[in-house]
Every structure is written in C-alpha cells, then in structure tokens.
C-alpha cells in the first residue's frame, strides 16, 4: 500500500455507510452534490482514487490495485459492510472489489459502465493532450483552456479536465498522475472481471439514456456477472449521471 486514499465525509447517520468512487480524471468533488443530498439519511464518503485528486501517486494504476487500496481504506476507517457506488472507472473498481471481497458489500451500485472491454482510443488522445501541455509556460488557467481547445473542443469537458490543474507556489501542476494513467489505459479500458467471476449480492446498474457506455446489448453480460442485479435508466442523462 502506498498511502491512504483522500476522502470527503458527509452526514452522520444511516448504516451501512455509502462509499462513492469517481471516474477517470475525476475526483471526490464530482460526488459532492449527491453526497450532500444523501447526507440526511446516510453517512457518505466520496473518495479520490489513487493517481487522482488529492490521493497518492504510484505507477501501478490497475483496477486490481485500486480495489486493494479501497480495502485498506475501509480497514483503516474500521468499516465493515458498505454500500459501494462507482461511476465509470470507479464502477470498474467497485465491480472488482465486490468480486474480491463480497462480504464487505451490503449493496452495490454501478453508474453507467458495463463489465466489458471498451476501446482505449477514446481516452488516449485526451490523456496525450493533457500531457503535451507545457505547464512551465502557463500564466493562467485561461491560457491552459485556450491551449487545449483545438484538441478538446467541447468547452464543458475541458472545464472538467482542468479541475485536475492546480497552482502551487506560483507554478501549475497536474493533480492526476497522467503518465501512469496513460501507461495503464489499455488495462483500465478492459473488463475488470474474468469470464467466470460473479457477484451474487444485490446490485443496481444505473444507465444514462443518452449515454453509449451501458447499452441494451450489454445487459446479458451484466446479468452473467451480476445475477441479482437490476438496471434503471435515467432517460435524459448522459454518461455523467451525477
């Protein structure tokens, strides 16, 4: 273990606690509004995955390693059985964790991701665009935004990516460990589960009606790995359900 995951805690009631995991290049802040809404009924933790946000950096960025980090964090917090909710990459970590440690899962919620392989080509140009940015020459976040615009034309998505940019001692730095994520992107894009693996516990898959990440043709695979699952659709939502 390289360190303890950074977390944000909301609420004091409700057991078992709810643990929320973000997607690739996200952070715990992505769950803040949802966590605050649920805080009256649950004790909620939103975590930064390794190589993201304020959590530690290391070269092993595999889903398996992240699931082990989650186990260490739960043990450090003295939490037994939890409800685990993961979005996108966080959903893959949650699936892996549930299969590895089923007794630690009360209920499982997977947000807009399936237990399948995804083409890494979607993420590679994004990571390479961020890695190519010359941070030493930046004077403002606006300059970073302008420099990325040609490679990442969607303004809203650029603002999401730039949440990873932080200024310290007059210099800009990436909070995410981009080089480790780029080196691991093939593994991060693949199915986190082996063909024969199953999780028998109660599982909810939440799907964005306008997202292509969890489609009707993926549901057979969902049922194979998660036989006690159901799928709910948010018709007007895209991939970023929260």
Predicted regions and their residues:
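Serine-hydrolase catalytic-loop signature spanning alpha/beta hydrolases and amidase-signature enzymes
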Residues: 14, 23-33, 44
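Active-site glycine-rich loops that stabilize anionic/oxyanionic intermediates
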Residues: 23-26, 88, 209
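Alpha/beta-hydrolase fold catalytic core
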Residues: 1-19, 39-42, 75, 79-80, ...
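Catalytic histidine-centered segment of alpha/beta-hydrolase-like enzymes
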Residues: 234-242
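Conserved alpha/beta-hydrolase catalytic His-Asp/Glu region
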Residues: 121, 136-191
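Active-site loop/oxyanion-hole signature of alpha/beta-hydrolase fold enzymes
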Residues: 3, 32-85, 89
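Conserved serine/cysteine hydrolase catalytic core
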Residues: 169-225, 230-233
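Flexible "cap/lid" loop of the alpha/beta hydrolase fold
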Residues: 95-100, 105-140
């Amino acid at each position: 273990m390289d360190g303890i995951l950074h977390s944000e805690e909301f609420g004091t009631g409700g057991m078992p606690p709810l643990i929320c995991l973000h997607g690739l290049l996200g952070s715990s802040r992505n769950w803040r509004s949802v966590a605050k809404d649920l805080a009256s009924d649950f004790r909620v933790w939103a975590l930064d995955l390794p190589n993201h946000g304020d959590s530690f950096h290391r070269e092993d960025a595999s889903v398996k390693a992240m699931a082990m980090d989650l186990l260490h964090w739960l043990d450090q917090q003295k939490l037994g059985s939890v409800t685990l909710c993961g979005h996108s990459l966080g959903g893959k970590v949650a699936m892996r964790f549930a299969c590895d440690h089923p007794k630690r899962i009360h209920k499982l919620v997977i947000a807009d991701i399936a237990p399948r392989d995804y083409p890494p080509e979607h993420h590679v140009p994004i990571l390479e665009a961020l890695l190519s940015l010359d941070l030493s020459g930046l004077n403002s976040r606006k300059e970073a935004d302008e420099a990325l615009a040609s490679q990442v034309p969607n303004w809203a998505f650029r603002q999401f990516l730039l949440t990873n940019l932080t200024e310290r001692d007059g210099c800009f730095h990436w909070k995410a460990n981009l080089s480790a994520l780029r080196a691991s992107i093939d593994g991060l894009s693949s199915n986190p589960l082996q063909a024969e693996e199953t999780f028998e516990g109660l599982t909810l898959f939440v799907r964005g009606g306008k997202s292509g990440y969890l489609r009707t043709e993926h549901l057979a695979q969902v049922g194979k790995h998660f036989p006690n699952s159901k799928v709910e659709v948010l018709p007007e939502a895209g991939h970023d359900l929260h």
